[in-house]
Design a protein with these regions (language model features):
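Accessory interdomain/linker segments of ATP-dependent helicases and helicase-like nucleic-acid enzymes
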Residues: 93-145, 441-579
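A non-catalytic, helix-rich entry segment at domain boundaries
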Residues: 244-321, 507
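Pre-ATPase regulatory/linker segments immediately N-terminal to the P-loop/RecA-like helicase/translocase core
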Residues: 217-220, 396, 401-402, 410-414, ...
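Mg2+/Mn2+-dependent nuclease catalytic core
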Residues: 141-171, 314-423
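Contiguous mid-protein beta-loop-alpha structural module that forms a pocket-lining wall or clamp
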Residues: 390, 400-463
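Amphipathic alpha-helical interface elements
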Residues: 1-101
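Short nucleic-acid-contacting surface segments enriched for D/E, G, S/T with interspersed K/R
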Residues: 120, 157-179, 564-566
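OB-fold/S1-family single-stranded nucleic acid-binding modules
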Residues: 172-204
Length: 639
């Protein structure tokens, strides 16, 4: 329709291509929601040459820019893209282009988007894996046009050899993020990081907990999701210590009172405290009370004295507690305990023990805690654009107390991301094969021989570490064949649902899953009613201890826009002042919709933010739906 705006015609053409490509891959083994990978797959299926493929990718990239409002549509470009799609359909459907359409198409190909100039260094690039030989990975870039696959060097000592195990797990059309890429004169890429399926976010604390005294096998991740926490006491103590930190950070002239703080703790965690089996023992209850008092005093000492010492870049007046981050670059997400608002310094707090045995007479951070710190540093670097060399990260062990300045080791970060990739590959395998035999072989790795990578021996291993691994194995082996079949089938079902909730549904029209937060264009979100934007603060009550909330005004959208939000929805709130702002480059705040009308939105925040500057009053905000992994955690535990 000539009378329709070009932008609308672009959207219709894009939807048409997405629908056709999705139909053409149905019943095939391709498991990806990414349009670039789907185009490559269909191009191979219907023998589109490299020029025809690139014309479709040119349309994909142009429509991305137009639908994200980064570019104004031009008629000449639209006709070029219409021609590319029409000629592709001609091959896919083995039918001639209707004469009415053919008559308006350009008679000759109009040159595609110009090739990007060769760069010597690329911060980050998304690619689609094709195949590998002994020297290179061969990949297709997602965001630029290339006439042939790009060669990527892997297993290079000192640069990316840590990803050797990741490479063995790759499958055709897998999505990869390549970070810190050096490009030589021949256009060969050498990345520092290879991140598999980055849209599948793994929680930082869950990843760090895979680092045990006996090794860091991916089976630790699967074991922890299937086994309930034996002793809730350390977790409770950690939560109460976080509450103490909050009180001391936001204390004015008057010091917080310990008894008042404990009353707050009982109001905040009544069921957890009442249900904790250890606290039913009077002697252990006394010990717990004593521990709480000790942590309270230690946190006071750190905040009132250590913070002020020269060399520590910490200012409690400009702190943010429990900020959340989503890092699509590395495929991870997490929440910090304490951060300076300018992101120059942050603290990860631990109420448990540090490593008291590795070096005699010296307390050192535990490996899993160091890993957690390193991942937060990497998130701030790759998501928020901070320079790791200028960061001041600290581990705070409130038990001693010890405020430990952490050092960056990017080789260790690469090893951790390799572990993340192996976990994601296993999750992909479970939902892709969806077969009991595959899952049986995967979970068979939960055994002491496989997981004891450091070959520990002696009393510590035999008495404290090995039994928890063996117990799961024994329980699973003791099941009847029918019970085992039920267990594996249900495990597959939950994992498939979890994978879909993160990466999206292959058969779903449009985008779904948590990854839609950064993969969908603004227009797609508007059309699905999945975003409220240009919100402004009416009332900021984020500092209230028990019912922290924020009241926002909803602007007048056009009448075609129908928001898909209701009371009780779990949401993400973030600053959105530019079209480029999204959940992967902004601090995010999680909460629930408490009340919504046509003009106002009230969000109950999950955490209290007493620093008013966290929510600048002149800023504009956006709200989108959030997904919660905790639901799946309880499903796995139900097994």
């Amino acid at each position: 329709d000539e009378n329709q705006p070009l932008e609308r015609r672009y959207r219709q053409l894009r939807e048409s291509l997405e629908r056709v490509v999705r139909e053409k891959i149905q019943g095939n083994s391709l498991q990806t929601t990414d349009l670039a990978a789907r185009i490559n797959y269909v191009a191979t299926q219907y023998e589109l040459d490299i020029k025809e493929q690139n014309q479709l990718h040119t349309f994909r990239l142009t429509s991305n820019d137009i639908l994200n409002h980064r570019k104004f549509p031009a008629k000449e470009e639209f006709l070029r893209d219409l021609r590319a799609v029409a000629f592709a359909y001609r091959k896919m459907f083995a039918q001639d282009i209707p004469l009415k359409l053919f008559s308006v198409l350009p008679k000759q190909e109009i040159t595609s988007l110009g090739k990007k100039e060769k760069k010597e260094y690329i911060r980050r690039i998304r690619v689609c894996f094709d195949y590998a030989d002994d020297t290179y990975l061969y990949v297709h870039p997602v965001d630029i046009i290339a006439d042939e696959p790009i060669r990527v060097v892997y297993n290079k000592p000192g640069i990316n050899h840590e990803f050797e195990e990741t490479i063995k797990e790759l499958w055709r059309y897998a999505q990869l993020n390549l970070l810190d890429v050096f490009v030589d004169r021949e256009g060969i890429y050498t990345p520092s990081f290879i991140v598999l399926e980055p849209d599948y976010l793994i929680d930082i604390s869950s990843l760090a907990e895979c680092y045990k005294d006996y090794g860091s096998h991916p089976a630790n991740y699967f074991l922890s999701r299937l086994v309930p926490i034996d002793n809730a006491r350390p977790l409770l103590l950690g939560n109460i210590a976080n509450l103490f930190l909050d009180e001391w950070i936001h204390a004015g002239e008057e010091e917080p009172d310990y008894i008042d703080c404990m009353k707050k703790a009982f109001r905040q965690y009544p069921i957890e405290l009442a249900a904790c089996a250890e606290l039913r023992d009077p002697s252990k209850e006394k010990e717990f009370a004593k521990d709480c008092r000790m942590h309270f005093e230690h946190i006071r000492d750190i905040v009132q004295h250590t913070f002020l010492e020269p060399g520590y870049n910490l200012d409690k007046k400009d702190a943010v507690l429990e900020p959340s981050y989503i890092c699509e670059a590395l495929g991870i997400q997490g929440r910090l305990d304490y951060m300076q608002r300018d992101m120059s310094s942050f603290i990860e707090m631990k109420s448990g023990k540090a490593d008291e045995f590795s070096i005699q007479g010296k307390v050192e951070p535990k490996e899993n805690n160091k890993v957690q710190m390193l991942l937060y540093m990497a998130v701030l670097e790759y998501s928020m654009g901070q320079d790791r060399r200028r960061m001041h990260p600290y581990l705070l062990y409130t038990r001693y107390p010890l405020l430990y300045p952490a050092r960056a080791s990017w080789a260790q970060v690469r090893r951790v991301i390799n572990l993340r990739n192996r976990i994601v590959a296993a999750e992909y395998g479970v939902q892709f094969h969806n077969h009991s035999d595959f899952t049986r072989n995967l979970l068979a790795q939960i055994n002491p021989e496989v997981m004891n990578e450091r070959k520990l021996r002696g009393r510590f291993w035999e008495q404290y570490l090995k039994p928890s691994i063996s117990r799961f194995r024994e329980k699973l082996s003791a099941l009847e064949p029918l019970e085992q079949a039920y267990f594996y089938t249900l495990y597959n079902f939950i994992t498939k649902e979890l994978y879909t909730s993160k990466s999206g549904d292959v058969d779903y029209e449009g985008r779904a899953g948590a990854s839609a937060l950064w993969l969908s264009t603004l227009d797609e979100k508007r059309e699905a009613g999945e975003i409220l934007y240009d919100l402004q603060i009416i009332e900021n009550k984020a500092s209230q201890v028990h019912k922290a909330y924020i009241l926002l005004s909803i602007p007048q959208y056009d009448e075609m826009f129908l928001p898909n939000f209701r009371t009780g929805d779990v949401v993400i709130l973030y600053e959105r002042n530019h079209d480029s702002d999204n959940v992967t480059n902004k601090m995010v705040f999680k909460g629930n919709i408490e009340q919504i009308t046509d003009t106002e939105l009230r969000i109950r925040l999950r955490a209290t933010y007493r620093n008013v500057s966290v929510f600048p009053p002149d800023s504009r905000y956006a709200v989108e739906h959030d997904t919660m992994d905790t639901t799946f955690r309880s499903m796995y535990l139900g097994l």
